[in-house]
Amino acid sequence: MSLFDHGVAKLHTLLKEGEVTVTDLVKESFDRIEATDDQIGAFLTLNEDAFEQAKRMDELAKMSDNPLFGMPIGVKDNIVTKGMRTTCASTFLENFVPAHDATVVERLHDAGALTIGKLNMDEFAMGSSNENSAFKPVRNPWDPTRVPGGSSGGSAASVAAGQVLFSLGSDTGGSIRQPAAYCGVVGMKPTYGLVSRFGLVAFASSLDQIGPLTRTVEDNAYLLNTIAGHCDMDSTSAEVEVPDYTAALNQDLTGMKFALPEEFMAEGVAPGVREQIEKAIETLKSLGATIETVSIPSVKYALSAYYLLASSEASSNLARFDGIRYGRRAEADTLDEVFTYSREQGFGDEVKRRIMLGTYALSSGYYDAFYKKAQQVRTLMKQDFAKVFEEYDAIVGPTAPTTAFKLGEQLDDPLTMYANDIMTIPVNLVGIPAISVPAGLSEGLPVGLQIIGNYFDESTLYRVAHAFEQANGGFKMPQL
């Protein structure tokens, strides 16, 4: 039995009683990484000082009242870590070592969590399969011939494989929830502005959000308790009071009303996924909830609007990578050639594709036809979702239309690859929270149930997800 088979609350008790040490937890993590990461490829950088840090924390653990004290965590490699390489899985930043921690990392360290290392991802968070990493693909612990999802593939795979207790990811169009679904773990994308983006390498600033990936809903709530809250270093950080999310966990679902959008169960949803989601809906009903089918017509435009908006913001954000200020610098004779060659050699194909799309959408003569129209669709979607939340407590449906696909299967078909995020993208465009929770297996591969909430109503999502998890059995460990 692994120590990580216990949740945060139980491990905290064991640490307080001296039955387990922080060093034991770190050893568990490193042993598991050594045993499995050649297969999985989840980590890009490991913390060389982890055991030394753990030894200093061993005695303090008995006195700490913070449930995260001594807990090993993995951090997605687009979240900066002081003194530890942050590459965004790109050769452009292959040797970049930040001088400060992201706010979320600082808050976790203040709580006593210990960073084990940096997790693999799609380059600059652009991808749905984690095949776009410049260094190596991440493989799904349930079947190493399949993708773990993206872009937070390393974050999901590391938790599913038992390499760390929990991890941080980022979600721009589903990059926490889709990998969570594919790997059979819990992934929360919080309300935009609830968690500071300071120290997150920007992809699309109006869509990006950091969130936790864990084995259980309870552990997820503990993690969000720590990282949520206003940050003066982030101009988009919301000034809202952060509740204790664990307080919502043991409430039942009696009298709650959920909406099931017909668009989320339309053609394109794999039969095995549909079957598990229909079972999940029956489980929610048995717990006292009412579920009604609704229509959110604007979601049919979500995919097109998202790729125009996200790519437009990316073309602006990634302009800073020029070979001059930091990162890769190509050898060249002129300044223009430095810019050109550095970006040509430093960026992968998917990053170049999105930069070109975004630059085109923002160019003279096309701005109104593409970018402006996409923003109008975004406004329409916000109105449509607001109408649903006037009558319903949450929205439910599949996290992804299929289970994890084979490595290499969709690399030559970007449009099919993009469609994997069709259920998750609307949440980012609207800015509301959503959680993916394991909903069973289809042909031996995990299926995720997505629960979507209103602005800053993460407590309701945890309430629903926890009740469903307890009834459905929750996390299952893949056999590696």
Swiss-Prot record:
Example GO BP: translation
Pfam family, one: Amidase
Enzyme class, broadest EC rank: ligase
UniProt cross-references to SUPFAM superfamilies, sorted A to Z: Amidase signature (AS) enzymes
Record field: catalytic activity: L-glutamyl-tRNA(Gln) + L-glutamine + ATP + H2O = L-glutaminyl-tRNA(Gln) + L-glutamate + ADP + phosphate + H(+)
Domain of life: Bacteria
One Gene Ontology cellular component annotation held by this UniProt entry: glutamyl-tRNA(Gln) amidotransferase complex
Keywords: ATP-binding, Ligase, Nucleotide-binding, Protein biosynthesis
Sample GO molecular function, one term: glutaminyl-tRNA synthase (glutamine-hydrolyzing) activity
InterPro entries, per the entry: Amidase, Amidase_CS, Amidase_dom, AS_sf, GatA
Family: Belongs to the amidase family. GatA subfamily.
PANTHER family, per the entry: GLUTAMYL-TRNA(GLN) AMIDOTRANSFERASE SUBUNIT A, TRANSAMIDASE
Quaternary organization: Heterotrimer of A, B and C subunits.
Function comment: Allows the formation of correctly charged Gln-tRNA(Gln) through the transamidation of misacylated Glu-tRNA(Gln) in organisms which lack glutaminyl-tRNA synthetase. The reaction takes place in the presence of glutamine and ATP through an activated gamma-phospho-Glu-tRNA(Gln).
NCBIfam families listed in its UniProt record: gatA
Protein name (Swiss-Prot/TrEMBL): Glutamyl-tRNA(Gln) amidotransferase subunit A
Organism, as annotated: Exiguobacterium sp. (strain ATCC BAA-1283 / AT1b)
